[in-house]
Amino acid sequence: MPAKGWGSLSQPFAGLIARPYNAECMRSRYQQKGSTMTEHFSQTLKQASEPLWTQAVEHSFVKELCAGTLSDISMVSYLVQDHRFLDSFLTLLGAAMATADTFEARLRFGRFAGMVSGEENTYFLRAFAALNVSEEARANIPDTEPTIGFKAIMRESATTRSYGAILSVLNVAEGLYLDWASRAPSPLPNNFVHAEWITLHDNPSFREFVSFLKSELDRVGPAQPEICRDFFLRAVHLELEFFEVNYRFGK
C-alpha cells in the first residue's frame, strides 16, 4: 500500500467539548463514606463523556467494519496507526501492574499484557500480510494527530503513578471497544481482518477484563475524581477522533 497521501490525516479534530464540570461537587459525591455511588463511578465518567462516547461506538467506521463493508484503505490506515499504540499501551499496562494495590490485579494485568503481546500482535501481522502492506510501507506512513495524542496520553497517565488515572485511560481504551464490538450483528464478516478484530474485543475473557477494569476504577477512582475525569474524557475524545480520521481517509 503506497504511503502517498497519509500526511493529510494530520488535520486536527475540533468541535468536541465535554459537558461542564464542578470538581467540588463530584468530590463530595464520591468521598462520602458508605455511599453506594462509588459503585458507579466508571458509569458516571462515561455519562460525563456523552455524546462523544455514543458517537464513537456508533461511528460509521465501526458500523462498516462490523458489516464487512469498510474499505481496505480505511482499514489499512486504522490498523497501521493502531499497531503503533502497542508499545505505549504495554508501557501503560506495566504502570498498572506497578501501581495496583493487590496481587490479583497485577496478575490480571500481566495476563492481559501477554495476550496483547501475543495474540493481538500476531493478528496485526497477519492482517498486514493479507492487505499487502509491507513493513517498509508502514514505516513510511506518518502518525496521525490522534495517534500522537494516544501515545502521549498513555505515557502521561503512566508517569503520573496514579492507579486511578491509569485505570481511566484503560477503561476507555478497552471499555469503548467492547461496547462497539458487542453490537456487531451476526454473522460476522467473512474477512478475518474484520471478524477477528471484532472477536478480539468481544469474547468472554475480554468482557471479564473490562468488568475488572470498571470495578477497579469504581473502587479507587472516587478518591481522585478530578484526575480520573480528565484522563477519561480526553481518552474518549481521542477514540472518536481516531475513528473519524481513519474513516475520512478512505473516502
Model-identified regions with their sequence ranges:
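Carbohydrate-associated surface elements
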Residues: 144-145, 206-210, 214-217, 235-236, ...
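Short alpha-helical hairpin
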Residues: 46-71, 89, 211-219
